Amino acid sequence: MKKLLTTMTMLLALGQSAMAQFGSCTPSERYEYKDKQTGVTIIGLTDTTKNDRFMYQTDPMWTADGKYLLFRSSSRGDGKEQETVGRDGKKRKYRPTNYFFIDLETYKIIQATDGKEGGVFLGNKSNKFYYNRREEGKWNLYEMDLDSFFADVKTGKCKKQKHYERFIGTFPTEMGRPGGMAINSDDTYAFISVERDGTDEEKERMSKNAFIPESNQPIKIKPVLSGLRKMNLQTGEVTKIADVEFKVGHIQSSRFNPDEIVFCNETGGDAAQRMWYAKADGSVVKPLYKETPLDWVTHETFASRDYVYFNILGFQPRLRKQASGILRINLRNDDVELLGQVEMKADGDQLRGRGFWHCNASRDDKWSAGDTFAGSVWLINNETGMRYHIAAETKMKPDHSHPAFGPDCNTLIFQSGHFTNGKRLNLMMVDLDKVVK
């Protein structure tokens, strides 16, 4: 009988895990290990049986009060496999992505969506969670009250998701087709990138000015007429910021100034001019860091009040004829600084000499971090130039490491396929106070 009860208990636990849903709270998966190559102690936040990812490194991942850390996963929750049809008419199967929070006091994992959400973004001033849904062909934006939600989760009396959310507005179809979004620093507007139809004259100019890559570079993303819009988070009103004649990608908002936007010309590779800066009223739309033909600029991050950090790639022989690595540009005077590149002999054996791929920085501008083509994560002291090898063999599969800093400027996070040989990603955290003494 005792054996039977034990078996039933295990089956019940497995069933509850499989049917995890909105508001469910599961035990901590936290563990620690020491990287064999770097000697750094790394905290694992999720176990190796799931495939979890942080948000893209340009977006905030900590709640405004710093108590919860956001991530996404298609292997958690109870989302069943679904089928969709792409623009090319081809069918594909997928599991819905759900969004989760890690309670940084207990490391318990809380499911915060039910798989119907598209893009998401955390509030900067208050514990709000913004997300859009496609409902009856409409793009609708919602705001979720996280304080109320977390309080109910702790008591075990979580209500349905609609209880915590407020409908903000519907995006008008005549304003374009919404893509990415970012919430500004005072939580008053959502900045939204769009694709649009435009005029024949615009299309002709766009085709004429389209970037022509080197012969060994594929064209991954074709240019498309795009623009920037903003939605008032109180009224839902949508207004135009600007139109551009290239595909807008990686839209970002300053976490300090409510009217500053950074975005990119997204080609899936190199561009004649990748980085762009705009004011929310549309009065300024200009290139940010004017590129030379040998500059392959990528993965810009609006990390601090006055600086945008970015990479100039050096992964091809032709690109190594000038400086490459992590740089930053001062938004107030356009001054540019090269912060560092990894030593070629220390960049692993697999892709030696290819250097940094993605970058980020702490809000106080003291630290920058980058991942490399070889799968290492590095930390740079921007004041001294000192470099610290944090992690090796992240595999950069099934996604890149994408390092990012916490709001305390002493915490570094990244994702890694180290323990699964690149089959699944686990979420990692490093306490920088223990690395730099």
Stretches found by the model and what they are:
Residues D114-S226, K240-D243:
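Asp-box/WD-like beta-propeller blade repeats and closely related beta-sheet repeat scaffolds
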